[in-house]
Design a protein with these regions (language model features):
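Long, low-complexity or tandemly repetitive, helically biased scaffold regions used
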Residues: 1-76
Length: 76
């Protein structure tokens, strides 16, 4: 791989890692807030929707982890 492309990817990966750190903080805060809600709210339709949104954010974070790993493997 051209050195210029490796440098571009490294810069992009730094940005993705920073984004993921922020995303993971949001996920943690949202999950803690959800966990502190009453069990009846958690089991309600709104509670289930809220947990689903948290799960979607976690899935996005997991996908970012995989993308970062794949990119690092590609430039090794």
């Amino acid at each position: 791989m051209k050195q210029k492309n490796v440098e571009t990817l490294n810069t992009m990966l730094q940005g993705l890692e920073a984004f993921q750190m922020i995303l993971d903080k949001v996920i943690q805060e949202e999950q803690e807030a959800f966990d502190n809600l009453s069990e009846s709210y958690q089991n309600s339709e709104k509670g289930e929707e809220r947990q689903e949104r948290i799960d979607l954010l976690q899935e996005a974070s997991d996908n970012i982890t995989e993308a970062i790993s794949n990119c690092y493997s590609a430039i090794e």
